[in-house]
Amino acid sequence: MGIKGLTGLLSQHAPKAIQEHEIKTLFGRKVAIDASMSIYQFLIAVRQKDGELLTNDAGETTSHLMGLFYRTLRIVENGIKPAYIFDGKPPELKKGVLSKRLERREEAKEEGEEAKETGTVEDVDRFSRRTVKVTREHNEECRRLLRLMGIPVVIAPSEAEAQCAELARGGKVYAAGSEDMDTLTFNAPILFRHLTFSEAKKQPISEINLKEALEGLDMNMSQFIDLCILLGCDYLEPIKGVGPKSALKLIREYGGLKGVVKHLRENSGCRGMQIPDEWPWEEAKKIFEKPDVLPADEVELEWTNPDVDGLVQFLVKEKGFNEDRVRKGAEKLQKFLNSKQQGRLDGFFSVKPKEKAAAPAPVGKAKGKGKVDAKAKGTKRKVGFLNSMSGPLA
């Protein structure tokens, strides 16, 4: 879900924080991409003309594999090196949200069945997309595909967005890539959005700079986390009557969530704002401040030659893809992943940093106990096909 209304607030109060780029201008960058969010997008967007998911002759869904293969090729062709980060175990506080999502999917499934009988094609398509869920099998197949492509894979102990942010903070990648704005709440210095969108959408890449966002909002990191929780996050019920404008006003007026909650408790129903009886915001804040992640210095990322025979076996023989297209895709991977990229021009200049309006408060780093990809073994936690190519190309 991300953070409700945050993009609009940043556009209004911190416009310098948001820049748009053509994908080709990001050559030389390494990016940690939220895999689960990307796979979800592919399952929704990569469809047949009738709106149904792509399948092979055996009736197996292939939308996620088709999307992942060709969108990753596009990213690599533009000189970007992606690493895909998969979700681990969700925080306990998130279980309520996940349960409600399941209920909504079941409702959409029932409405979809009714639409097949009495509704239009558009109704059926709409309800079908609302029932989409990324399954364990989807994740396993995508990890297998990425390993065969020579793309690094990380399985986070918990939230993928938090792990993406950790790798960006630790200098393993330049940016985190996700549609979820809570990646910023996990303290990602740079967030790329729309990176895995279809080229046909002609949607530019949106780059959001956390430092500029904090300066524009005139907040420190602790206050920013409070604002995001108040706007509405994955861990708590939203407060009725609180929208983006009122959330920003409350945080500025009371300095943080502690003062806001005290005010709302003492003035129940004030201006229609009603805080739930059970609203453990302190627990939610701890998840954002000290997420369960693999420390960046224990993760190495390596991009290697694709396993062409393995790709043909998996995509062509098992999943029914076109062999010629798969082989051509593998050639592109080999060419672009292992070519010596021209250095970025901005790497030759030192930029004098602007004075901070409000410095971000330090965010602690919890050492995660999550598992790493099965291929990852060694003195350090190695991910996918890994060695020493870990620093971002500035």
From Swiss-Prot:
GO MF terms, alphabetically ordered: 5'-3' exonuclease activity; 5'-flap endonuclease activity; DNA binding; magnesium ion binding
Residues annotated as binding DNA: 47, 71, 159, 232, 234
Binding site for Mg(2+) 1: 34, 87, 159, 161
Annotated segments matching region I-domain: 123-254
InterPro entries: 5-3_exonuclease_C_sf, Flap_endonuc, HhH2, PIN-like_dom_sf, XPG-I_dom, XPG/Rad2, XPG_CS, XPG_DNA_repair_N
Disulphide bonds in the chain: none
Region (Disordered): 356-375
An individual GO BP term: DNA replication, removal of RNA primer
PTM comment, free text: Phosphorylated. Phosphorylation upon DNA damage induces relocalization to the nuclear plasma.
Gene3D superfamilies in alphabetical order: 5' to 3' exonuclease, C-terminal subdomain, 5'-nuclease
Enzyme Commission code(s) on record: 3.1.-.-
Binding site for Mg(2+) 2: 180, 182, 234
Co-factor(s): Mg(2+)
Broad enzyme group: hydrolase
Ranges where the record places region Interaction with PCNA: 341-349
One GO CC term, this protein: nucleoplasm
UniProt region (N-domain), positions on chain: 1-105
Keywords from the UniProt entry: DNA damage, DNA repair, DNA replication, Endonuclease, Exonuclease, Hydrolase, Magnesium, Metal-binding, Mitochondrion, Nuclease, Nucleus, Phosphoprotein
Locations listed in the record: Nucleus, Nucleolus; Nucleus, Nucleoplasm; Mitochondrion
Cofactor remark: Binds 2 magnesium ions per subunit. They probably participate in the reaction catalyzed by the enzyme. May bind an additional third magnesium ion after substrate binding.
Function (record text): Structure-specific nuclease with 5'-flap endonuclease and 5'-3' exonuclease activities involved in DNA replication and repair. During DNA replication, cleaves the 5'-overhanging flap structure that is generated by displacement synthesis when DNA polymerase encounters the 5'-end of a downstream Okazaki fragment. It enters the flap from the 5'-end and then tracks to cleave the flap base, leaving a nick for ligation. Also involved in the long patch base excision repair (LP-BER) pathway, by cleaving within the apurinic/apyrimidinic (AP) site-terminated flap.
Protein family: Belongs to the XPG/RAD2 endonuclease family. FEN1 subfamily.
Subunit structure: Interacts with PCNA. Three molecules of FEN1 bind to one PCNA trimer with each molecule binding to one PCNA monomer. PCNA stimulates the nuclease activity without altering cleavage specificity.
Protein name, entry field: Flap endonuclease 1-A
Organism: Laccaria bicolor (strain S238N-H82 / ATCC MYA-4686) (Bicoloured deceiver)
Taxonomic path: Eukaryota, Fungi, Dikarya, Basidiomycota, Agaricomycotina
Underlying gene: FEN11
